[in-house]
Amino acid sequence: MEPAFWQKRWADNQIGFHQAQVNPYLQKYWPRLQLAPASRVLVPLCGKSLDLAWLAGQGYRVLGVELSRQAVEGFFREHGLDADVLQHGAFEVWRSGEIELWCGDFFTLQAEDIADCVGLYDRAALIALPPQMRAAYMRLLSAWLPAGCRGLLVTLDYDQSLLGGPPFSVGDKEVLQGFAGWQMDELEVVELIQESPKFLQAGACSLLERVYRVKR
C-alpha cells in the first residue's frame, strides 16, 4: 500500500471507512479499560475520526497519526478548532487542546514518540494494511508501547479470496500471533454480512467484526 493510494482516496472522497458518528464499541467498552485521567492514547491511521474528539472529551490526551493532510485539516475544520502547527522530525504536528494529530507516515515514528502512550485505539488501522505491513505494524506496537498499555482493537474477518482489501480480512489467529505476549480478550463478535452489499455481491457468506480488549 503506497502512500499515494491513500492520498488519492482522500482526494477523491472515497472514504467509506469514515464513520459519521462515534463508534459504538468505543463508547461501550472504553470505560472498561479504566485508564487514568489525562492518559495519552495512540490512535494510528486515524483519518478525521469523530472518535478522536470523543476520547479528548473523556479527559484523555489524544495522539492521532494520519498520512493525509487533507484528513487532518478536515478534522480541525469540521470541529471548529484552531490548531497550532509545528514540525517534528518527518511529521507535521497539528495541536489543539488535548488533541495532537501527526501528519505523516506511521512507520517513520520513533520509539520515543509513543513511549508514554498508555492507551491504544485501533478501529480501522490494522484492517487497512496488507499482510506484510500488518506484521510490521504489530511488531512496532509490541516493541514501543509501554508495558501495561491497554486498548481496543476492531477487526474484520471474511474470505479474502473473494474480495481484495482494504479493508483487509484479519482473522483471530493472525491477531493472536501478531500480538503474542499481549493479553487479548475478545469482547464481542458481530455478523455484518446482511448489512454489507459489496460482500454479498462478491459471494461472501460471512463478515465478522471482532472487538478485542488488549493489554501489553
Curated annotation (Swiss-Prot):
InterPro entries: SAM-dependent_MTases_sf (IPR029063), Thiopur_S-MeTfrase_Se/Te_detox (IPR022474), Thiopurine_S-MeTrfase (IPR025835), TPMT (IPR008854). It catalyses: S-adenosyl-L-methionine + a thiopurine = S-adenosyl-L-homocysteine + a thiopurine S-methylether. It is an enzyme of class 2 (transferase). Keywords: Cytoplasm, Methyltransferase, S-adenosyl-L-methionine, Transferase. It comes from the Bacteria. It is found in: Cytoplasm. GO terms for cellular component: cytoplasm. One of its GO terms (molecular function) is thiopurine S-methyltransferase activity. GO terms for biological process: methylation; response to metal ion. S-adenosyl-L-methionine binds at W10, L45, E66, R123. It holds the Pfam family TPMT. Its EC number is 2.1.1.67. Belongs to the class I-like SAM-binding methyltransferase superfamily. TPMT family. This is Thiopurine S-methyltransferase. It comes from Pseudomonas putida (strain GB-1). The gene is tpm.
